[in-house]
Design a protein with these regions (language model features):
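Acidic, surface-exposed loops and disordered segments
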Residues: 1-221
Length: 221
């Protein structure tokens, strides 16, 4: 079904950073659709440098709570906490095992095309974007993860599900907890961003505010 422009804008106006959920669990079909939106999201070179961690276990939420100051109003009343992990430099080197798996097993490239893709990626990484150090490579992977998160929040809104993106957390402590829980392998992943999902307990306290299109758009014709 094709949505009208008005329906699309209605979805975007519905979405807001929900600070209070009503505690109801999401329907399984809704949550699976939101996850699928993340899975089907685009990524540079098609390398999908992310992993989605879905947290509902109360004990883990309690461990994360002191270090997630930006989500303390929603951690306990949301239906799901999503933690998106981003790949580290080790997995994003042109000749890494992970990228080899992606090219062969996921993208289905022939050995010849894998070699050509590896060379093109290496040239782009080194000469175009200067991604030769650990932190810039991880930050690039985080940027890819935000594409997936944006799609997940938009699809959630289209289903009448609310969300709240969270960057307010102590990364080192959250990664330590996830490592202790056997969820995160620090040689492969770091935490990119979090978000909570559920049903709003109350309407937004004020209307959505944004700059006008004229302020943020330059036309070159």
């Amino acid at each position: 079904m094709k949505l009208t422009p008005e329906q699309i804008l209605e979805i975007f106006n519905f979405r807001h950073a929900c600070k209070k959920f009503d505690g109801r669990p999401l329907h399984e079909a809704e949550w699976n659709t939101i996850l699928e939106a993340g899975r089907l999201s685009p990524s540079s070179f098609g390398y999908e440098p992310w992993h989605f961690v879905v947290v509902q276990k109360r004990e883990l939420l309690e461990k994360l709570y002191p270090w997630t100051w930006g989500g303390q109003r929603t951690l306990y009343n949301a239906s799901h906490l999503l933690i998106i992990l981003a790949r580290c430099q080790r997995d994003l080197q042109p000749d890494s095992q992970y990228l080899g798996h992606m090219m062969r097993d996921v993208l289905g490239l022939t050995p010849e095309l894998c070699q050509a893709r590896e060379e093109r990626y290496a040239t782009w990484q080194e000469r175009d974007f200067d991604l030769t150090q650990e932190r810039p490579v991880f930050d690039w992977a985080c940027k890819q993860s935000y594409i997936a998160l944006a799609n997940m929040m938009t699809v959630a809104a289209s289903l009448g599900v609310d969300s709240c993106p969270i960057e307010g957390f102590k990364r080192t402590e959250v990664e330590r907890i996830l490592q202790e829980e056997g969820i995160l392998e620090p040689q492969h992943f770091g935490v990119a961003v979090m978000a909570t999902f559920g049903y709003r307990a109350e309407a937004p306290h004020r209307p959505k505010t944004r700059q006008s299109l004229g302020e943020i758009t330059t036309w070159v014709r």
